[in-house]
Amino acid sequence: MSFRKSNIYLNLLNSYMIDSPQPSSINYWWNLGSLLGLCLVIQICTGIFLAMHYSSNIELAFSAVEHIMRDVQGGWFIRYAHANGASFFFICMYIHIGKGLYYGSYRAPRTLVWNVGVIIFVLTMAAAFLGYCCVYGQMSHWGATVITNLFSAIPFIGNDIVSWLWGGFSVSNPTIQRFFAFHYLVPFIIAAFVIMHFMALHTHGSSNPLGVTGNLDRLPMHGYFIFKDLITVFVFLFFFSLFVFFSPNTMGHPDNYIPGNPLVTPASIVPEWYLLPFYAILRSVPDKLLGVLAMFGAILILLVLPITDRSVIRGNAFKVFSKFFFFLFIANFVLLGHLGECHVEPPFVVMGQIATVIYFAYFLVIVPVVSTIENVLFYVGRKNAK
């Protein structure tokens, strides 16, 4: 027996990363998992080095970021790698979720993998919001004010929760300090859930583009798919480097280069681009409490897909109607992202409300109805074939 199999620790690594049998038909959409792991490593490593030079005191936070940029050797690279790493993390995560929606990765027996993935998604959004506030630029201050104020929509105890979160009567020094503490902690919680995600995936193995269970036509992870992953890793690093070195502020907001000022309200308060679709849903509902419920519901509704999808065939590879509505959903999601950065004025308000209805209808109406129709067509076609 080889040493990698006889050693208790190396055997665990071997079963997950070397000899793990993978479907031979998986394509490059299955490489997003390794890219997300790379993004998480980049974020944790750059975040640790940034924390060495950052001060969470509200009087020093903005200056500390400028100190990192100007005085720390290589500080500009660490800061830009961390900021753009967050954007690339969400790019990969949205594509990964889209792949899961298209190929039915949420279907049994991989429902647990999907549910843990949704938890990782929520935690990543929380970490991104907390980190955005730590810069304490103008948009950071007002973004923190708006988002934390959402808890005031909770009946009876909402205002008390907001004051408790702030540590005072407005976003102040205790707020930024506790946000930084949680921002440092959450990535390690995400890493723990990533391990759980990996363990749940290892139980039944990866799905495949065909949507069928094939335990015979498989190849070992190392030698085949490790090399395949490396191709997309280098492509990712190429585009990541383009942004870090040549256009580091493209995915940021210019107002965040102004120190946070509670006396001056920006013309438009918007979060980072990767939170815009859900921000648009929040703004599309006139009632504050219902808007908050809609925003959080838009994220957690991913958990209902294993229940609402009634199709007997996993994935959309061979389903024409499901393909059409899936791409309609993607276009609608992109539209929500654009509407999230627009001013609250006609016609954007009505467009946001229509896009919000379509978003929820996809999960609660379109998927179950279309999957049922396709089931009927499948059984009729199979009966006629006999």
UniProtKB/Swiss-Prot annotation:
It is found in: Mitochondrion inner membrane. InterPro entries: Cyt_b/b6_C, Cyt_b/b6_C_sf, Cyt_b/b6_N, Cytb/b6-like_sf, Cytochrome_b, Cytochrome_b_C_euk/bac, Cytochrome_b_N_euk/bac, Di-haem_cyt_TM. The chain crosses the membrane at residues 32-52, 76-98, 113-133, 179-199, 225-245, 289-309, 321-341, 348-368. Disulfide bonds: none annotated. Signal peptide: none annotated. The keyword Kinase does not apply. One of its GO terms (molecular function) is metal ion binding. Coiled coil: none annotated. Pfam families: Cytochrom_B_C, Cytochrome_B. One of its GO terms (cellular component) is respiratory chain complex III. Binds 2 heme b groups non-covalently. Heme b b566 binds at H96, H197. Its cofactor is heme b. GO terms for biological process: mitochondrial electron transport, ubiquinol to cytochrome c. Component of the ubiquinol-cytochrome c reductase complex (complex III or cytochrome b-c1 complex) that is part of the mitochondrial respiratory chain. The b-c1 complex mediates electron transfer from ubiquinol to cytochrome c. Contributes to the generation of a proton gradient across the mitochondrial membrane that is then used for ATP synthesis. Heme 1 (or BL or b562) is low-potential and absorbs at about 562 nm, and heme 2 (or BH or b566) is high-potential and absorbs at about 566 nm. This is Cytochrome b.
